[in-house]
């Protein structure tokens, strides 16, 4: 789907200076997924799908219509889950019902401070916490990180946050997508360190400082 322009994801701060690589990555492992289902009491039926208490195991992935890459990612995710025995399909609703959907494929990113894309996303009742995720330890660690300007204090808090998030995931992280831009060599001042994906401020964050030689 992304033609090699990206990397598998395992956490919220993977491309940030505060990334903690020593957490569970949840790498793609179909056999482990089957084992988890069976440990949870699911049994494989004659139709190739798992059942639990007489009900077929599955869910619907909702995805926005305006981003074909996300639609394609959702389709592949559904196909891979079907291959291990889960009845997973996708839908492309005209309007997003944050409270009524079963799962939603979403994306976000920020080249700025770690607080910018953690506190508001994973903090209880925060504005970008669309899934209603709530974890007291996550709240505590994110608050500690944003209340300090000491890099060591913040690193310790973000390390703990990432460990807890891996133990109690809010999302299934799929991938980080690279952004590719082409600009005339005469344009000076483009900052590659703040280039991000297809939405947000992105490459134009400092356009007022650009010059043409």
Q: Over which residues does each language-model region extend?
A:
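Non-membrane alpha-helical structural segments and their capping/turn regions in soluble enzymes
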Residues: 71, 135, 139, 151-155
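Short, solvent-exposed loop/beta-turn-alpha elements that line the ligand-binding surface or hinge
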Residues: 18-35, 45-57, 99, 119-147, ...
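Active-site lining segments that contact anionic ligands and/or coordinate catalytic metals
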Residues: 56-58, 101, 169-171
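Short strand-loop junctions, especially beta-strand C-caps/beta-turns
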Residues: 62-66, 93, 148
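Append "and occasionally in soluble cytosolic enzymes with long acidic Gly/Pro-rich linkers
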Residues: 1-76, 160, 211-212
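Periplasmic binding protein-like
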Residues: 61, 79-128, 158
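Sec-exported extracytoplasmic/periplasmic mature domains
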Residues: 2-7, 14, 18, 38-43, ...
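Solvent-exposed loop/turn segments at secondary-structure junctions
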Residues: 4-8, 17-19, 65-69, 95-96, ...
């Amino acid at each position: 789907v992304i033609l090699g322009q990206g990397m598998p994801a395992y956490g919220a701060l993977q491309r940030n200076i505060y990334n903690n690589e020593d957490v569970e990555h949840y790498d793609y492992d179909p056999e482990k997924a089957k084992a988890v289902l069976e440990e949870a009491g699911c049994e494989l039926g004659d139709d190739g799908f798992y059942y639990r208490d007489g009900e077929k195991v599955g869910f619907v992935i909702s995805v926005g219509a305006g981003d074909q890459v996300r639609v394609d990612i959702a389709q592949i995710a559904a196909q891979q889950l079907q291959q291990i025995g889960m009845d997973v399909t996708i839908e492309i609703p005209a309007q997003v019902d944050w409270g009524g959907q079963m799962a939603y494929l979403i994306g976000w990113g920020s080249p700025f401070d770690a607080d910018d894309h953690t506190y508001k996303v994973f903090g209880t009742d925060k504005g970008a916490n669309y899934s209603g995720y709530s974890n007291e330890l996550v709240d505590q660690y994110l608050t500690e990180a944003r209340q300090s300007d000491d890099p060591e204090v913040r690193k310790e808090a973000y390390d703990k946050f990432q460990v807890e998030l891996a133990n109690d995931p809010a999302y299934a992280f799929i991938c980080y997508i690279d952004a590719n831009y082409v600009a005339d060599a005469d344009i000076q001042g483009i900052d590659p360190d703040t280039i991000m994906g297809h939405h947000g401020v992105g490459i134009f964050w400092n356009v007022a400082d650009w010059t043409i030689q």
